[in-house]
Curated annotation (Swiss-Prot):
Autophosphorylated mainly on threonine residues. Some phosphorylation on serine residues. Autophosphorylation on Thr-168 is the major site enhancing kinase activity towards AfsR, and is regulated though interaction with KbpA. One of its GO terms (molecular function) is protein serine kinase activity. This is Serine/threonine-protein kinase AfsK. The active site is at 138 (proton acceptor). The gene is afsK. It is an enzyme of class 2 (transferase). The keyword Acyltransferase does not apply. It holds the Pfam family PQQ_2. Keywords: ATP-binding, Kinase, Nucleotide-binding, Phosphoprotein, Serine/threonine-protein kinase, Transferase.
């Protein structure tokens, strides 16, 4: 898919004319371009901050030289490069073909012989790459294009040079958790070609089954599965197990090299003597061959029809499995609803498609604003043209058993609080980014902040973009009228209202965690560093080294709460003064192994205690002294921090959390007593349980479970069409959450009845946010959505 160029994109790179955007990666943007002779190439550019690093330039120059030596048939050849340009770039041959990810998502798992054919081609490509002194380090389905005569491996040009490990950068993230090797997850600086062989095995699992071998709810959980549980090989044909299991040996020395793999595969592929045994048509299903031919001829890919239990949109870009046991969702309309044409001077407005308790709420194509919406005065004139909303339940929904998906709850619930209306004159909008959107939106005053490589500030009222940062932001926090962000090695702050630069400093390593509170910015950097900065001017307040390096993710970084910084260092949890770095106390929490191989997660509560989840343990430590109030032990590890609710246990007060296997615990905050525990039917994620209005809400697998906070009695359960993503949001008697089935759901919090749902073009990312009657959500379709929390995409309401 090629996107249009923005006003900030170059029109020429070196001798090439730039035609469009192909995408973006961790190191920069990728463009489609054309040479003077008409040859099309893919050009990968390098981010500005990396280009300013002289050590990176040396590494990049040497790897370009090595990449030129890769000449295998199954790789996309390097055409040209300029590592000394102001913005370094690398051009490779453009291959108009679908990726392996697209083929499997749209056509289903491959037959066993097709998997062998794919494996042989990729193994030969790896032999060429390794022979040039490179390790790919990010071999995955989206980096393998499939053409008629075999696969083509791409994105090896900025791999890690194995001939000079001194040049390996510690502040450049390379690799995808679902497909990386164990040694890469532990230390990405010391991998060898055997790491690519493990990734090949993981990729073959996806090709043969339709799901990756490791598929946690987030990168931390995925790495946990990789290192502790082993691959999920459900659905893998027995005849492929010896091949794939040999590639996925935990010890690198036990894996075959690419030449061994080719020798192992040759008898299966070429023993028949068939002339066409090396082509896609000999092995792939007819539909997949048609997809390849269509892409080669410039035709767009045809999306598969969606069935009730099918694969139509059950596979997102991550390759997650389609739902198997979920109840069927009502099918979307065969076409977008027809919106009456407004007068020439009146812009079109979105029609309300689906009302409360109806089918999926859909934003009709041309009638939905991409970016800023029309003026309120125009909305009043156009509102009369909108068709009335449907009020009946979708026909394909059958009445579920009590307590499930909106049937009568097992226990009567109290009446919800009266709903809060959206601001007068406001109407729903969506804004489409030019790049992927990730994470949870932040709302402050009249702006919503979203990360899409840069930080984008959108006007709450209209959806217009107020500004965006000029730098990439991998980490972001909004506090005290400032945006604090990091592009990796640089920490910077901007005015949250206007986007003006306030300050920027260079850090010694890649920032993977960032928090801001009470005038202090706390960062955690790769290699075990933790730093505190003055939020207003950027001066470094203090720094410690030797912090844990087993889990370098935003969830596992140093924590900042009410003037206290919590650092996991030398097997101890240390409480430091956030302004001075002075140690107040420390507790022997243990190392990663003694904590069950999972990060330590904590919550500081207003009762003067910090509640800590460390593996299978939960502890209550006094904030002032570190004194242990109580200790609780569970049979399974906890991935999420505890949730504290003030008040006595008889009114629902206490500490709530769910373990990795999905069991929900209610602990007495005064003594740690296990008041009740309820086992759900699927594993939990790293998101904390949500407690509101006497209810405990927890997303576990495809189910959203609601329990009575006092007794643990199940109130209701809602079954979504895919795994629940992020933490639900509760406000004004409604609960909002996203799912991997591309839907944003809104339920009545008291009984679980479906209020409305929005069908997006991708998986919901992060968690929805509700503010002043508006729910904000981001999707992998590159859109930010702002919807009426009560009605979804209802008509505009004005005073």
């Amino acid at each position: 898919m090629v996107d249009q160029l923005t006003q900030h994109d170059p029109r020429r790179i070196g001798p090439f004319e730039v035609l469009g955007r192909l995408g973006a990666g961790g190191m920069g943007l990728v463009y489609l371009a054309r040479s003077a002779s008409g040859r099309r190439v893919a050009i990968k550019t390098v981010r500005t901050e990396l280009a300013e690093d002289q050590l990176f330039r040396v590494r990049f120059t040497r790897e370009v030289e090595a990449a030129r030596a890769v000449s295998g048939f199954y790789t996309a050849a390097v055409v040209d490069a300029d590592p000394r340009a102001a913005v370094p770039w690398l051009a490779t041959a453009y291959v108009p073909a679908p990726s392996l990810e697209e083929i499997v998502n749209e056509c289903g798992p491959m037959p066993a012989q097709a998997v062998r054919w794919l494996a042989a081609g990729v193994a030969e490509a790896l032999q060429s790459i390794h022979g040039a002194g490179l390790v790919h380090r990010d071999l995955k389905p989206s980096n393998v294009l499939v053409v008629e005569d075999g696969p083509r491996v791409i994105d090896f040009g900025i791999a890690s040079g194995v001939s000079n490990t001194r040049l390996t950068m510690t502040n450049v993230a390379v690799g995808t958790p679902a497909y990386m090797s164990p040694e890469q997850a532990k230390d990405s600086r010391s991998v060898t070609g055997a790491s690519d062989v493990f990734s090949l095995g993981s990729m073959l699992v996806f090709a043969a089954t339709g799901h990756p071998p490791f598929h946690g709810a987030n990168p931390v959980e995925t790495v946990f599965m990789l290192l502790r549980e082993g691959p999920d090989l459900e659905g893998l044909p027995d005849e492929l197990r010896p091949l794939i299991e040999s590639c996925m040996q935990m010890e690198a020395t036990g894996r075959p090299n690419p030449a061994d793999l080719q020798a192992q595969l040759a008898p299966h592929l070429f023993g028949s003597g068939s002339d066409d045994s090396g082509t896609a048509s000999a092995w792939l299903p007819e539909r997949a061959v048609g997809l390849i031919e269509g892409r080669r001829n410039g035709r767009p890919a045809v999306k598969p029809a969606t069935t009730a239990g099918g694969r139509g949109h059950g596979h997102g870009p991550s390759g997650a499995r389609a739902p198997v046991h979920a109840p069927p969702l009502p099918p979307p309309p065969a076409h977008d609803p027809v919106v009456p044409a407004p007068p020439a001077h009146v812009p079109a407005v979105p029609a309300p498609v689906g009302a409360p308790d109806g089918g999926p709420v859909r934003l009709p194509g041309a009638a939905v604003p991409i970016g800023p919406g029309p003026r309120v005065a125009d909305m009043r004139a156009a509102a009369v043209a909108a068709p009335p909303p449907e009020s009946a339940l979708a026909a394909s929904w059958s009445r579920p058993r009590p307590g499930v998906n909106g049937a009568d709850p097992a226990v009567p619930a109290p009446a919800p609080a009266p709903p809060e209306a959206s601001p007068a004159g406001w109407r729903p909008w969506r804004f489409r980014m030019s790049n992927d959107v990730w994470g949870t939106p932040r709302v402050a005053e009249d702006l919503v902040y979203v990360t899409s490589f840069e930080v984008h500030a959108l006007d709450v009222a209209t959806g217009r973009r107020r500004f965006k940062t000029r730098d990439v932001a991998w980490s972001m926090a909004v506090a005290d009228g400032r945006i604090h962000a990091s592009d990796g090695p640089t920490l910077f702050a901007l005015d949250a209202r206007e986007g003006a630069d306030l300050w920027r400093v260079q850090t010694d390593a890649w920032v993977y965690s960032l928090q801001a509170d009470r005038g202090t910015v706390l960062t955690a950097t790769r290699g075990g560093g933790v730093q505190a900065w003055e939020a207003s001017a950027g001066q470094k307040l203090w720094e410690v080294t030797g912090a844990q390096t087993d889990f370098e993710s935003p969830e596992a970084g140093a924590a900042l709460h009410d003037g206290t910084a919590y650092v996991w260092q030398d097997a101890r949890l240390r409480a430091l003064d956030a302004r001075t770095g002075d140690e107040r106390w420390s507790y022997p929490i243990g190392d990663a192994a003694s904590c069950g191989g999972v990060p330590v997660r904590l919550t500081q509560a207003p009762d003067g205690y910090v509640y800590v989840a460390a593996g299978t343990r939960v502890l209550a430590l006094e904030v002032a002294s570190g004194h242990v109030r109580w200790h609780f032990e569970a049979p399974a590890v906890f991935l999420a921090p505890p949730t504290f609710v003030p008040g006595p246990a008889v009114t629902g007060g206490g500490v709530y959390l769910a373990d990795y296997l999905g069991t929900v615990y209610a602990l007495d905050a005064t003594d740690g007593r296990d008041r009740w525990r309820i086992a759900t039917e699927a594993r939990s994620s790293t998101d904390p349980v949500l407690v509101a209005a006497g209810h405990v809400h927890v997303g576990s697998g495809k189910g959203l479970y609601t329990l009575d906070a006092v007794t643990g009695t199940p109130k209701w359960r809602f079954q979504a069409g895919g795994d629940i993503v992020g933490a639900p949001a509760v406000a004004e008697g409604r609960i909002h959450f996203g799912s991997s089935d591309h839907l944003l759901y809104t339920l009545k919090a008291d009984d679980g009845r479906l209020r409305w749902k929005l069908a997006t073009g991708g998986e919901i990312t992060g968690s929805p946010v509700v503010r002043d009657g508006i729910v904000y959500a981001c999707s992998k379709d590159r859109c930010v959505y702002a919807l009426d929390a009560e009605k979804g995409t209802g008509t505009a309401r004005t005073t």
